[in-house]
Amino acid sequence: MKRALIAFILFPFLGAAQSQLNTSLLFHWMDSTIIGTSLYNNAYNEVWGMVYNNKEFAVIGSTDGTHIFDVTNPSVSTQVAYIPGADQGAAIVHRDYHDLDGYLYIVCDEGSSTLQIVDVSDLPNSFNVVYDSDSILKRAHNIFIDEATAHLYVCSEKKTGIGNNFNALHIYDLSNPALPSHHYTYNDVGHVHDAFVKNDTAFLNCGNEGLRIVDFSMVGPLITTVHNELGSLTSYPDAGYNHSGWSTADGNFYVMADENHGHEMKILDVTDYSNPVVLSTFFSGLNSDESMPHNQIIHENYVYTAHYHDGLYVHDITDPLNPELTAFYDTFDPTHYSSYMGAWGVYPFLPSGNVLVSDMQTGLYVFEIDYNGTTDIKNKKKTSSLLFPNPSNGLLTTHLSTINNLQVYDLSGKLVHVSKSIKNEAIDLTFLSSGFYTIQLEVNKELFHQKLIIE
């Protein structure tokens, strides 16, 4: 049976550019000599951003190590630092980053790795690796620094040696930034995948054990007081592997994602930590059965999501009950949803407003977002309103009174079908072979484009 998946995109032209909405590509980097992993063929992983000496920097991880670019002027971006990983090669899937007060902290979750600390305060002129050892930790999945307290939260920490060498969460004190010291360990769950922390109140993404909200403000190496669990959430719409999340600046709302195909992101009201409430769900709008969010960050009223196979997505959550799509850019060309591929990380906090994205297969991107641009997509509930039904066997109808011109292009960009002056008629595309197509619709001198997958 043929099946059509549709998403509507407003473009000024078709061309050979990636699918995008209100997004301008300012810089793209990838290095074909860097090998991909044996698991997911990803040469790249996390992205982070930094500002020092009035310069903007992008940090991206690879199977080789850590690459730092000066992206102050994106059109002439250059790599200004490279830190080789303690372990390298096809087994290295994850690296993660956070910086504080001139120091960049680096972890890796595979191989014979180390905690790496880099003095980046003199970039772009110089940098200095001040710590590179496995004596504190050998591997970790993610890290987050609570800037208000200078505490480093290490998720799923593995230490060297045998025996009890794993901590679901380990908190370190960064009073000495070049030599973190033990502050507290938390092992109430099997593991913590990721964390968002503000003033030592932590939102912990605990995989299949859901979300935990924990107060660590009264703990320390010389204090007998233990942590205080403020709330949890294990049963909610599209519950799966609770993967990551971010809070709004006022702390009233929290957006989280479950790393499962077909699972949508959730916006939570967390004004009462003891009773977090899911207000709405949303996703890219492309494939309700297969699309999968990875990492998301909230800045002002927008959620920026690295949405794996679908690329970068930006949603306006001014009204948390009705998130609206603002922009997107497809960083991953293939149309399949196999495994874990595509956009990995996103960083929206640079003073310029430019947004950094890392793609597992295609590398580093710097984007400019047009927040005032026109969009014909407001949210996922409206993405199927121009042509329907969806799914479809290729026989489509429209509520538009007139489509002046319809053109269908295959993956190579070849024009394979044209229809003119369609008026409340069925659109028969059942003759097309299974595959990926781009359809251009001209309606009242406006051009719309849509992705069409016929299966």
Each language-model region and where it sits:
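Intrinsic low-complexity/disordered segments
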Residues: 15-17, 447
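C-terminal outer-membrane/trafficking sorting elements
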Residues: 6, 381-455
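A short, polar/charged loop/turn motif at coil->beta-strand junctions and beta-hairpin connectors
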Residues: 17-23, 41, 379-383, 392, ...
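Residue-level detector of functionally pivotal "anchor" positions at catalytic/ligand-binding pockets or at interdomain
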Residues: 368-388
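Sec-dependent N-terminal signal peptides
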Residues: 4-13
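Feature marking well-ordered beta-strand scaffolds used for ligand recognition
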Residues: 17-374
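Hydrophobic alpha-helix-in-membranes signature
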Residues: 11, 275, 322, 388-390
